[in-house]
Structures are given as structure tokens and as C-alpha cells.
């Protein structure tokens, strides 16, 4: 029984299947963790969703910003952009089934035995684990309800960018969504910066990567995340695992076998352009 953590798939179905064959992943025996952004940019978003859904209890995933954007397109709120290559999925006969399944997936995964936490963008240093759990449940409850289009219409935006337990309503939900799915840099007090997308070395002072600011979750748990392809899996502290290595941009799809911390890599079938990845 092994646990495999894989970074952002972004519709790269062929690379996903090749990587799973490489590690000899066995559904029903092994467990697959996915950091979110299953869809968009790669050519196989439909096949990725069908396959991941078919895994049932053998998969644990979190939603990413591109997954949420897909749901907004599906709900008629956002425009379907050709570069996202989502049309085959949106026009598929099982689109309703797949996307209603997708919107019921979580923002946060926790394994207490492994002391492992996973979220698409990471965990803001302003939260302890109990707060992160409660915040994830708040958004998950709205997404799985009949009123989810109303939330998706209001989720776009960069403010508020500072956590307070007093946040209420759509502002609270927007902050939670941004923290779980869009965060990269923070100010020293943990306040989110939603504008900078440079590499950590090029970010203006006083910004730091979220994982460089001490927080209560990282003191007790390992954290796995995706979202930040331009990191190329490098530069994180011990116990923080950056798994998005830009497969859809011509990088690679990366897998971490949790039990022995061994990495496996499947090169992308596309030309490398991590500069575009930094802007996504």
C-alpha cells in the first residue's frame, strides 16, 4: 500500500497515465493524492476527469483555481477561453455528471496519521489547522449546494486579502478561496499579496513566499501543494512539498511516493514555457 502525490495535471492525461504506470499505481491498494488544477491548458481535461472520478476511494484530491474557473464556465458565469481547451469537456454527454462531481470535491485534505496536509496553493500562515478546516468547509458547503453559481460569480477578486475571524459573507468566502487556490506571496504578517507572480528571488520586498513565513500548521504537519509551477519543485523548507512542475507548460509531471519520499518524473509532451506558467 503506497501513497502517491502528484502535482497539477492540467489536462495532461497521457503524461498522468504514463506516470502512474511508471510507479505501478494499483487502485484499491494504493492511494493517489492530486494537488488540484486537474483541467485546462492540456488537451485531455475530459479524459483526466473521467479517469480520476473512476478511481473512487483510491483518490484524494483538492480543487484548484482552474477547476473553480471551469465550474464558473459550466455555470455560464465565465467565458470559455480557447487556450484552456475545455470545449470537449463542456460538450461531453457526461459533462453534467462530471462537473457536479467536481464541485463536491474538497479544498483541503488531511491525513492525521501521516501528519500530512494538502491544499492547491498551500496554507496561509495566518491559520491554524482548525481554522483551515472550518474555512474549507464553509466554501465546500456553498459549492455543493444549489446556490453555487452565486458564489462562483462573486469569487473573482483580490480583496479582502487579510484574514480576520470577523470576516463574513462573500468577502470571507473570497478570502478563503484565494488562500487555498491562488496564494503565492504574503507580507510578513501573513497578509496575501495577489499581484506578484515572480520567482521568490525576484519578488519585491517585503514579500515572501507563504511557506517562508512561520505558521502553526507547518510546525506540526507536512504540507503538499501545487499551483506554483515556476518554483519547479525547488526552494521550499523541509516538510513543504511543491509538486507542480509545469507539465502543461512543457515541464514535467511529478509524483512523490510518500512512504520513502522518492520522486518520479514524467516529461511533458509539450514545448517548455514556464514563463507563461508564472502568469496563470
From Swiss-Prot:
Coiled coil: none annotated. This is Bis(5'-nucleosyl)-tetraphosphatase, symmetrical. The keyword Hydrolase applies. It is an enzyme of class 3 (hydrolase). Belongs to the Ap4A hydrolase family. It comes from Shigella flexneri. HAMAP family: ApaH. Signal peptide: none annotated. The gene is apaH. Keywords: Hydrolase.
Amino acid at each position: 500500500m503506497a501513497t502517491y502525490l502528484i502535482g497539477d495535471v492540467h489536462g495532461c492525461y497521457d503524461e498522468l497515465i504514463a506516470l502512474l504506470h511508471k510507479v505501478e499505481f494499483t487502485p484499491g491498494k494504493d492511494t493517489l493524492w492530486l494537488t488540484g488544477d486537474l483541467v485546462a491548458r492540456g488537451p485531455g481535461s475530459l479524459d483526466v476527469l473521467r479517469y480520476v472520478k473512476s478511481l473512487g476511494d483510491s483518490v484524494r484530491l483538492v480543487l484548484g483555481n482552474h477547476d473553480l474557473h471551469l465550474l464558473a464556465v459550466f455555470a455560464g458565469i465565465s467565458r470559455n477561453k480557447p487556450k484552456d481547451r475545455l470545449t470537449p469537456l463542456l460538450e461531453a454527454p457526461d459533462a453534467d455528471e462530471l462537473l457536479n462531481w467536481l464541485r463536491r470535491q474538497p479544498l483541503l485534505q488531511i491525513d492525521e496519521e501521516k501528519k500530512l496536509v494538502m491544499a492547491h496553493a498551500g496554507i496561509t500562515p495566518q491559520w491554524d489547522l482548525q481554522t483551515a478546516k472550518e474555512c474549507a468547509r464553509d466554501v465546500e458547503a456553498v459549492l455543493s449546494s444549489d446556490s453555487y453559481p452565486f458564489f462562483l460569480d462573486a469569487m473573482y477578486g483580490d480583496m479582502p486579502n487579510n484574514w480576520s475571524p470577523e470576516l463574513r459573507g462573500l468577502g470571507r468566502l473570497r478570502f478563503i478561496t484565494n488562500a487555498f487556490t491562488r496564494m503565492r506571496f504574503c507580507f510578513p504578517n501573513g497578509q496575501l499579496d495577489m499581484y506578484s507572480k515572480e520567482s521568490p528571488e525576484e519578488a519585491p520586498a517585503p514579500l515572501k513566499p507563504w511557506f517562508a513565513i512561520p505558521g502553526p500548521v507547518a510546525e506540526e504537519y507536512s504540507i503538499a501543494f501545487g499551483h506554483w509551477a515556476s518554483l519547479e519543485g525547488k526552494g521550499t523548507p523541509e516538510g513543504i512539498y511543491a509538486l507542480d512542475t509545469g507539465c502543461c507548460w512543457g515541464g514535467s509531471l511529478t509524483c512523490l511516493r510518500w512512504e520513502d519520499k522518492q520522486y518520479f518524473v514524467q516529461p511533458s509532451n509539450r514545448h517548455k514555457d514556464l514563463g507563461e506558467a508564472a502568469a496563470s
